[in-house]
Amino acid sequence: MSEVVTVRSPRSKVIAPWVRTRLRTAPGTALALALLVAVTAFLAAALPRSVDRYGDTGLRQAVESAGAGRTVVQFNAPPDYGAPAPERDAGLRGAALEKDHAGILRATGRSLPLDRAQSASGVRSTEPQEMAEPWLPRPDGLPPRLDVVAQSGLAEHSRLAAGRMPRAPGDVTARTPRVEGAVSTDTARRLNIEVGSVLRFPGVQRDPLEIRVTGIVEPRDPRGSYWSVAPLMRTPVLTVLYGDPELRQYWKGALLLPPDASPALLGTATEPYRYWNLAPAVDSLHGHDVPRLRTAVAATESGPALQRVREATSPLVSATSDLDEVLAHYERLRTAIGPLVAVAAFGTGTVAAVVLLMAGGLAAGRRRAELTLLRARGGSLTGLGGRLLAETAVVALPAAALGLAAACLAVPGARLPYAVAAAGGVALLGCLALPLRAVAAHRAVGVHTAREDVTAARPSRRRTVAELTLLTLAVGAVVALRTRGTSDGSDATGDQLVSLAPVLVAVIAALVLVRLYPLPLRGLARPARRLRGAVGPLSLARAGRGSGSSVLPLLALLTALTTAAFGGSVLSGVADARDRTALMTVGADARVESLHVLPPDLADRVRRTAGVDDVTVAGIS
């Protein structure tokens, strides 16, 4: 009978992974590294997004301040006088204009971000006509002059203040004797126009065209492009008669017609023309997209886009816009401040990199004995570096991702790739700082490492060559900055060496201080030995045996100081130049002027205004 004996081997002990062990034994260190990387990644990712957002805000303010009259792309075309009268009349009606407007939108494509709600089409007069109605105001005895505008979308962009919206039948022609119209509330108030008023425009080989006002409208968005391309549509103005030595004034305003009433203008002396206004979508403009926008505007004004528009509408179409000039002015301003932004970015980035390197160096210094023991017991540099890399990566990568997410939430509406690259650079540096420092310090295997002594250390030749190279670069950057400034010409953005000048100066200053630091210690060490007591000699000995890596804190501090000082001096110079330019242009902090005599009590009223110290009254004849 056989007997079976079962032999069980003792269970082998499971060794905990390195990363988990390190995180459990030093949670405070891991938390500190995560916090440092998260904050640095947040700042690094927020910087390019903030630059983008400020650039977008500046561009939008530039476009808004330029006014719709300059930024709208306007296509114009005269009536087709060579066509038969029915076709010519039909080409000016609302349906034909809307069809052409749709064709223009298709022809221009998506090269320009357009605000379709504020875009419009219509017919308007070229020559404002003198009104003979005796009830119209005449400030200096001159009759008012009125334009006639038949623009699409009047009902959608206004609300009725009195009366009803004007209507037009579909059979209006150049011989139609009377049509309906409307005026804005400002026009009605200043020109004494009421519902039921009749205005007569001189005819050409026909009786005058009568326009009966059926409604008074109030603009829903007076500052929108719909009303601002031709401001006379909403607000009449007092205009000085050209060439009049007495500077007499007359009122100038506009009457609003329904689009289907446009053919009636062909029988008047107003010289009507068709137009299609494309308003840019200001909220969709981005500062980094200006070169592409300028190319699109140029193509629309006199390029392939204009050719497609002519094929879709009429060969007589022309395009005009000052949007390219507005974009060019903004681009010059952005180019001028680009080097200053680069200086700030280089300075801030250098400080952040130094702080991360300093954190890695401190961590390697605290674990010096541990890492020395690992190398002495057979640990390879590759294995040591890999373990440390995994240890820092498991903390730094999630922290950097958290900082990136926080930056995207804090600064919305900007490009993501640059923020991801900046946060990725922080994560990479946070992961590699400790492994690289440890590998560099423990290349050779040894149980004992020599104690650092600043007073006895002698810089190596490689360090001397590196320092001299940095010194040469710093001198070249400073000389270039002093001779030609931050940019080389009106279209330059400044080279990176010039932008690095404050950082290089800080690096050289830190290296010089580190070089000079041992000299007073050596000079004081020998006299201190003759002193009574142990405090003085021991203090000097302790200072002399300090770590030689003190260059990193010095570099961080000096870089921050030099960058801040450079930025402060630039801002101060810009403020002084702005004040000086304003003073030379205006002659004072503010100036009130008019072609006519100002009210006699205006000076006293201005003098009583808060913040006004003195008022000078002057007359120029």
Question: Which residues does each PLM region occupy?
Answer:
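N-terminal Sec/SRP start-transfer signal
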Residues: 1-44, 452-470, 514-563
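Membrane transport/envelope proteins' first extracytoplasmic loop
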Residues: 1-350, 486-499, 512, 582-590
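Alpha-helical transmembrane segments
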Residues: 346-353, 414-434, 494-511
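Hydrophobic alpha-helical transmembrane segments that constitute the membrane-spanning cores
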Residues: 347, 390-415
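C-terminal membrane-exit region of the final transmembrane helix in multipass inner-membrane proteins
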Residues: 403-463, 472-487, 514-515
